[in-house]
Amino acid sequence: MAASDTERDGLAPEKTSPDRDKKKEQSEVSVSPRASKHHYSRSRSRSRERKRKSDNEGRKHRSRSRSKEGRRHESKDKSSKKHKSEEHNDKEHSSDKGRERLNSSENGEDRHKRKERKSSRGRSHSRSRSRERRHRSRSRERKKSRSRSRERKKSRSRSRERKKSRSRSRERKRRIRSRSRSRSRHRHRTRSRSRTRSRSRDRKKRIEKPRRFSRSLSRTPSPPPFRGRNTAMDAQEALARRLERAKKLQEQREKEMVEKQKQQEIAAAAATGGSVLNVAALLASGTQVTPQIAMAAQMAALQAKALAETGIAVPSYYNPAAVNPMKFAEQEKKRKMLWQGKKEGDKSQSAEIWEKLNFGNKDQNVKFRKLMGIKSEDEAGCSSVDEESYKTLKQQEEVFRNLDAQYEMARSQTHTQRGMGLGFTSSMRGMDAV
């Protein structure tokens, strides 16, 4: 029985030895990911030596309690090694952020616990690969952050340069505006100055165009320039131009008026004297005879001829070149005939008949004469009445009396008695009797 117990004791440490080896490997792998790269070969050699020692201990039939104490010692040694490696890593990567340090220390402890729970060699290899990947990703992030910081510095420097250029351009604009204000006071003096100013403005606009394109690169759009003063300057220039044009037009009109006066004087001289003689006198004096002067001389000759024939002269307010003097004289004659008073002469027979017409009633006679516009001449009418006219007047009186009687009868039938039928009644017979 004693021999069998010893054999079991010998077998037990042999069975437990592979478990120990796995735990040792896991504990060695639980070192921080940055240290695992550099100390991978050393950990392997140590694990092999520990395997050999554990085999020797199994052969010597050590007890389980002994093996437990050995495990505790080994775990203490490993923990001290871990602390050293972590301190070393902290010194190497002191430039990293505080968040990464905390994450690395916490990840180390979590990994140590997980590895003690799990017992598989393949998983440890995958974890080491993941650590390497994380390490690479962190290095990439550092590079990216450095490049970003450089870009930010560059963008800041660019923005400063743009601000400086803007301030310079604003100062230039202010200078230009101040110059333009001082110039605008003396714009109305000369036209040449306004032309030179407009040319200089065009040049400035051409110079400022490429600057606007360079400003468009900035993120914030620049505000539009204030153009109120420019419009005012343009309005002043337009007023000055209008004034100049008005002055020119006035000068031209004055010249035309002077020429017309000269022509009228020449025409008057031609009218008073012979036109041929005046033209000859002008030629003799040496003055140039223009076609206008010749036309004025001809018109003056026509006016003199019309005056001699009709005795009517064309007034001076008419244009002698546009008015025919003979036609003007005929029109004046007609006007005089129309508007002159009537001469006292013999009246026609028809006028006398209408004047002496008698309706048998004085009121009717007065009304008729007023309507016809005949003046009352009773005394003259009574004295100058002939026998023939007297007969005609009597006949007219009878006719008018008969008409009045018939009118009264018709009125009584239609309005008062209201006769029936077509009118062939006793009333009509009574009319015939009357």
Curated annotation (Swiss-Prot):
The modification N-acetylalanine is found at A2. Residues 1-27, 66-111 have a biased composition (Basic and acidic residues). This is Arginine/serine-rich coiled-coil protein 2. There is a cross-link at K375 (Glycyl lysine isopeptide (Lys-Gly) (interchain with G-Cter in SUMO1)). Residues 35-51, 112-214 have a biased composition (Basic residues). GO terms for molecular function: RNA binding. InterPro entries: SMAP_dom. The keyword Ubl conjugation applies.
